[in-house]
Amino acid sequence: MKKFLPDLIAILAFIILSFAYFFPADIEGRILFQHDTAAGVGAGQESKEYLERTGERTRWTNSIFGGMPTYQMSPSYDSTTSLKGVEKVYRLFLPDYVVLTFIMMLGFYILLRAFGISAWLAGLGGVIWAFSSYFFILIPAGHIWKFVTLAYIPPTIAGVVLAYRKKYLLGGIVTALFIALQIQSNHIQMSYYFMFVILFFVGAYFEDAYRKKELPHFFKASGVLALAAVVGVCINISNLYHTYEYSKETMRGKSELKQEGAAASQTSSGLDRDYITNWSYGIGETLTLLVPNVKGGGSGSTMSQSEAAMAKANPMYNGIYSQLPQYFGEQPWTAGPVYVGAFVMFLFVLGCFIVKGPLKWALLGATIFSILLSWGKNFMGLTDFFIDYVPMYNKFRAVSSILVIAEFTIPLLAIFALKEILSKPDMLKQEKNCRGVIAALVLTAGVALILAVAPGTFFSSFITTQEMTALKQALPAEHLAPFVANLTEMREAIIASDAWRSFFIIVIGCLFLFLYQLRKLKASFTLAGVALLCLIDMWSVNKRYLNDEQFVPKSKRSEAFVKTQADEIILQDTTPNYRVLNFIGFPGNTFNENNTAYWHKSVGGYHAAKLRRYQEMIDHHIVPEMKETYQAVATAGGQMDSVDASKFRVLNMLNTKYFIFPAGEQGQAVPVMNPYAYGNAWFVDKVQYVNNANEEIDALNDILPTETAVVDVKFKEQLKGVTEGYKDSLSTIQLTSYEPNRLVYKASTPKDGVVVFSEIYYPGWQVTIDGQPVDIARADYILRAINMPAGEHTIEMWFDPQSIHVTESIAYAALALLLIGVMLLAWTQRSKIAKKS
């Protein structure tokens, strides 16, 4: 027990720190109102109600964007239930928010202990990793999947380290377990980025094994890790496989539309190049690693909120300063900077000089790699190469987030440097190491000092192009120059204030090291001093972006989905399946909110991975039709019988039965029933085959969907090549039963015909007519269509992909392998203890 006492103390310290940061909100039960979390609740409400009602999970919901799989909404599979039990134990059953910071610290602590670093130094490492500013920006934004995935990455790498340190079985189990946990956390982008880090690590261990002539050991460890990776991946194979299949149909997949001109230079598969690089870190903005407000801070903070800036403000312009953001970097918008700690940066740079071995070069290389790729459109040569040639890279947006690699490698090398210093009291007195100290001081404290006294040295302008354009339009010509000069002075003051702060933090940290080298401080006091300094530094910066004022009573979460009078009126319609289109805040809000989806089946919605074809319909038809509809309904005073239905044929074919319009200035809403919606399904007179996606989407401008179905020739076989349908007053089809993943219709027709359903086409849907399977075709770019034989029939349509059952079997087998590994480890440890006794 005594052996593990330092570890228990470290874990207890992590718990205390986590509770302390969120005090008093954690004690009072207050919560953060997070946009992405709230959006997830809205999008998942239909699935949640179905689970509560039936005890089964639905893999499809009609709540947003007309309908889509739930693979990236609620990626829960029965095979991961036991894994979630393990996760709860690992998290020590701690409450929300508190547990996030705790697991972030614990994971890095496990990694450092795997390296053989003392519990006290590993505890410091856990703190400086976990308190990097980016993580505290993720929490209020609601990017919890990303946060948790990042928290499980250090212990995953700990397994890699253990395996290469000849603890094969333990390393393999740890690697497999945490790969499984991080993939379950469902942010593949972060896992993907850290595959590069692992490659850097493997390269370092290969070099070390080669020099020591231990290549057999290297290959043995690599084999164990490869098996562990397979097990970890297979435990999550259901999630991974269906995410992969789904991604091909989303905005991350290949568009079938042929682009012309500049658009043709975008990626042929994956996200568009501009979309991938829209959030690119500025080259000068990289200095936020050292000085947090080097680009002003976050977009959500105005100039008037900065004391340093307002001390320089011309009172004449105070009204403008209350509207201008402090941030003036290259990104369109940011919640805050990536800051890893001033003294941590000093230790990292010092580590580049005093730490020996290939792992140092791996960490330095990974850091540079991360920074260069984070520049995105500001360094397009490298970015283009990765988009075009590196598998999967073009599937992810916001390249600035690859800086998480630097946030990992910088504190890791910093701890290695501090370990060297504390274990060798005289090392900094050596001439070559003195040069390293001087270089580290120049590159950190020196840069901070220059930023403090002359910010213009690094930046040519403190005003963005967009701001300058707006100011030229808003200000009289005679005020433009003095305003720009004053704004520049204010932003220089913001930078200088934080730069002085970083400078003195580095000086104080160096003073601790200097006193230790002079034998004036013991190693324990030096470590405690550095830990306190780093904690105060990073804690205070994080409080700028996540503080107690942001927490609200739990009741606020439910208030986000309070049923409005418009909702009440619409919900009186007991028809089982129709759609609602919310015009409030159009165009920006319609496709950026899920409040509508909480109560209704929405044409709009918010999700990072919507179906690509639906997005293309939004761009080509839905948004233009919304503009026409808004104007037409407003002109008609809400009297729909005076509105030309040909202006919104696509909305009608989506069975958009209700529009929600703004009424008055107090946020009120009024529902308007659309009598022209086509209903759940209809017979058509004609099938028009087209040769490609461009012809298909363009044809919708010319046809009347109730009469003609536009079908790609690729689906001609599914409709048996028919070109003429049959439709008269005797041909009817009616939805009789609705579940999100199962629809039942009754149809009657005197002749064979073709039916189009106002449901979104997606591979995996199955249809039977009177129990006999039939093929589904895609019609009108996004809808489903089938051949209907003459007579009276029951049509059943359901979504239960066979692939789920196959992948679940694989996942259970992988779980069994992991359990066998754990049992084998326990047996070997017991045998070792028995031998010692």
Residue ranges and their predicted role:
Residues F346, K657, L704-S837:
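Active-site-proximal, structured, solvent-exposed surfaces of multi-pass membrane proteins
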Residues K2-K746, D752-V756, I760:
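Conserved luminal/periplasmic juxtamembrane motif of membrane-embedded glycan-processing enzymes
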